[in-house]
A protein has these predicted regions:
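Conserved ABC transporter NBD signature motif
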Residues: 50-66
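Helix-to-loop junction immediately C-terminal to a conserved catalytic motif
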Residues: 42
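The feature captures the beta-strand-to-loop junction immediately N-terminal to the Walker
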Residues: 27-29
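Conserved ABC ATPase "signature" region
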Residues: 88, 99-115
C-alpha cells in the first residue's frame, strides 16, 4: 500500500498483516506518516495504491467489512454536552450499546455519568479519556489509538492501559501509535517503526 499527496510521498510499500487478539505498536517521529497510516487503516483516507484488509479469526475481511473505533490525536467531541451526553449521542447512530453500558464505561474511566459538566470545561486529560471511551465503547473489531495516554496522569494511564488489554482479550485488533515507550513495551505484541516512508517490524 502506498500514499502520496500530489507529488509528495507519505507512505511507500506498506505491507502489514494484522490479526485479531493482538496489539500492534507504531513508533516514529512527528511527520513520518503515523497519523496518515491510521487514517488509511480507519477508512477515512484512501491509499493511492493498494488496499487494507484485516484478519478476524480465520477470516480475511475488507476494510468496509469490519467495525472500527478510532482515536485520532487532537480529536474533539461536542463542547456543550456532558460526558454521558456525548457518548449517548454517538451511540445513538449505530444503536449497538445501551445507556447502562455507557454509564459503566464512564465509571471505569473515572467519570460520573450524572455529572452535567460540559466537555468544553474538561481538563485536557478528561477530554482525552472521553475520546478514548468513544473509540472502544461499541467493542469494534478494529481499534486505532493515536497517542492514547497523552496528557493523562498516572491513574488515567493505568485505566486506559487496562481497558486496552481487555479489548485485546476480547479479540479486537488494536493499533497503538505512541511516543510513550512504556506504552509500547507494556502493551504491544509486535512493534513497527515508521521511517523514510516505510513501515518496518522491529
Amino acid at each position: 500500500m502506498c500514499k502520496s499527496i500530489h507529488t509528495n510521498l507519505i507512505l511507500d510499500d506498506v505491507n502489514l498483516e494484522l490479526h485479531s487478539g493482538a496489539i500492534y505498536g507504531f513508533i516514529g517521529q512527528n511527520g513520518t506518516g503515523k497519523t496518515m497510516l491510521f487514517r488509511i487503516m480507519a477508512g477515512l483516507v484512501r491509499p493511492s495504491e493498494g488496499w487494507v484488509k484485516y484478519y478476524i479469526g480465520d477470516n480475511e475481511r475488507n476494510i468496509g467489512e469490519v467495525s472500527k473505533g478510532v482515536m485520532i490525536e487532537n480529536a474533539e467531541l461536542y463542547p456543550e454536552l456532558s460526558a454521558f451526553e456525548n457518548l449517548d449521542c454517538l451511540a445513538s447512530i449505530n444503536k449497538k450499546i445501551s445507556k447502562r453500558e455507557i454509564k459503566e464505561i464512564l465509571y471505569r474511566l473515572g467519570f460520573d455519568p450524572k455529572d452535567h459538566k460540559k466537555y468544553s470545561k474538561y481538563s485536557l486529560g478528561m477530554r482525552h479519556r472521553l475520546v478514548f471511551a468513544q473509540a472502544v465503547m461499541e467493542k469494534p473489531d478494529v481499534i486505532l489509538l493515536d497517542e492514547p495516554t497523552n496528557a493523562l496522569d498516572e491513574e488515567g494511564v493505568n485505566l486506559v492501559r487496562n481497558m486496552i488489554k481487555e479489548e485485546k482479550d476480547r479479540g479486537a485488533i488494536i493499533c497503538v501509535s505512541s511516543h510513550n515507550k512504556e506504552d509500547i513495551s507494556i502493551l504491544c505484541d509486535e512493534i513497527f517503526s515508521i521511517y523514510d516512508y516505510k513501515v518496518t517490524k522491529i
